[in-house]
From Swiss-Prot:
Name of the protein in question: Argininosuccinate synthase
InterPro entries the record matches: Arginosuc_syn_C (IPR048268), Arginosuc_syn_N (IPR048267), Arginosuc_synth (IPR001518), Arginosuc_synth_CS (IPR018223), Arginosuc_synth_type_1_subfam (IPR023434), AS_cat/multimer_dom_body (IPR024074), Rossmann-like_a/b/a_fold (IPR014729)
Quaternary assembly: Homotetramer.
Enzyme Commission designation: 6.3.4.5
CDD domains attached to this UniProt entry: ASS (cd01999)
Residues the record lists as binding L-aspartate: T120, N124, D125
Broad class of where this protein is predominantly found: cytoplasm
Length: 406
């Protein structure tokens, strides 16, 4: 790749991307445009602007993408009940396509030669950023400094920062912070003591949730309303997508809901350990499953459950903009036509549980399932023929085994 003259950098204002900004300037002698996405990470983003200005960025973009993030990425994913490896709600994975989309759009608007990101050469994010970028612009050039420079450790990064007078953030304990990714859906923490999967994560790692043991001793009941698979209200109050998730985060965080200690299989081949906090997402998943229980046909629900792991894997691996993800999304969205109604949930000391659900689109018929007199709604004699037909192949198999002496 010829040396770029202008690069758009996905910039958080943190240590890694600040070092990358300086490295791009010194390594390529190029203009650097910074792009900072507000995805609800809960930080004041103006310091990122000030830092980028101080370091000589030629243009600075800071954009509030919270509504777009939840409406166009998080909610479609939750219609699928997507979970990776049975536990992970994909909080980091689902944020990357939107960041890449805006990186490419800004690069085109600025006439930039390339885009750059701060993902390491060991992780999944490098794949996610770059697959999304190439899917949107096949001619885009991507610079991944972690795959080029010799700053191969946190210690070397800090030495570089000190040499170039780049401020180094400290945590409350006066130490360099964990590697943290945060957005409106979740917070993840990696590195340091967490790299030993045998060690219990210290409580100071958690930023978004109280310890469940310290959560209120009285449960809280809430109601979440859905329309066509998307949450639209809490306790009867209509809300925008980002507002729904923000409120669920507040409720879940106060009750210690959504903590996860996970060793996951990365797309690049290795296993990694992360601490995830997804309070609102954990409530949303439980609520969505609750409303589907009464509105989704059994066959459609079971097919959705079969498709979900593949869908989740596509998002985890960075294939949001792939045709196969879009095909699955179309099927999932079609299944949500009648997923409308209300779910009541109980929040208590780290747990969320559906305790009630109702809908004008419900398939639940009390007349058919009652243990009392069903007034002729269901003739139990019909079950005999149903069983005989389904038993036929099993009886034929058993007869063959008997004939062959097995």
């Amino acid at each position: 790749m010829s040396a770029p003259k202008k690069v758009v950098l996905a910039y958080s204002g943190g240590l890694d991307t600040s070092i990358i900004l300086k490295w791009l300037q010194t390594e390529y002698d190029c203009e650097v445009v910074t792009f900072t996405a507000d995805l609800g990470q809960g930080e004041e983003l103006e310091p990122a602007r000030a830092k980028a200005e101080m370091m000589g960025a030629s243009a600075i973009y800071i954009e509030d993408l919270r509504e777009e993030f939840v409406r166009d990425f998080v909610f479609p994913m939750f219609r699928a009940n997507a979970v990776y490896e049975g536990l992970y709600l994909l909080g980091t994975s689902i944020a990357r396509p939107l960041i890449s989309k805006r990186l490419v759009e800004i690069a085109e608007a600025e006439g930039a030669d390339a885009v750059a990101h701060g993902a390491t050469g060991k992780g999944n994010d490098q794949v996610r950023f770059e697959l999304a970028a190439y899917a949107l612009n096949p001619d885009i050039k991507v610079i991944a400094p972690w795959r080029e420079w010799d700053l191969s450790s946190r210690t070397k990064l800090i030495d570089f920062a000190e040499k170039h007078q780049i401020p180094i953030a400290k945590d409350k304990r006066g130490e360099a912070p964990f590697s943290v990714d945060a957005n409106l859906l979740h917070t993840s923490s990696e590195g340091k003591v967490l790299e030993d999967p045998a060690e219990d994560a210290p409580d100071y790692v958690y930023q978004r949730t109280v310890n469940p043991e310290d959560a209120p001793n009285t449960p809280e009941y809430i109601e979440v309303g859905f329309e066509r698979g998307d949450a639209v209200s809490i306790n009867g109050e209509a809300m925008s997508p980002a507002t729904v998730l923000t409120k669920l985060n507040e409720l879940g965080g106060a009750h210690g809901i959504g903590r996860l200690d996970l060793v996951e299989g990365r797309f690049v081949g290795m296993k990694s350990r992360g601490i995830y906090e997804t309070p609102g997402g954990t409530i949303l998943l439980e609520a969505h499953r609750g409303i589907e229980q009464i509105t989704l046909d059994r066959g459609a629900a079971h097919l959705k459950d079969e498709l979900m792991p593949r869908y989740a894997e596509l998002i985890y691996n960075g294939f949001w903009f792939s045709p196969e993800r879009e095909m699955l999304q179309a099927a999932i969205d079609a299944s949500q036509a009648h997923v409308t109604g209300t779910v009541r949930l109980k929040l208590y000391k780290g747990s969320v549980r559906t305790v009630g659900r109702w809908s004008d689109h419900s398939l639940y018929s009390e007349a058919h399932v009652t243990f009392e007199d069903d007034a002729g709604a269901y003739d139990q004699k019909d079950a005999a023929g149903f069983i005989q037909l389904n038993a036929l192949r099993l009886k034929l198999l058993a007869a063959r085994n008997k004939r062959l002496g097995k």
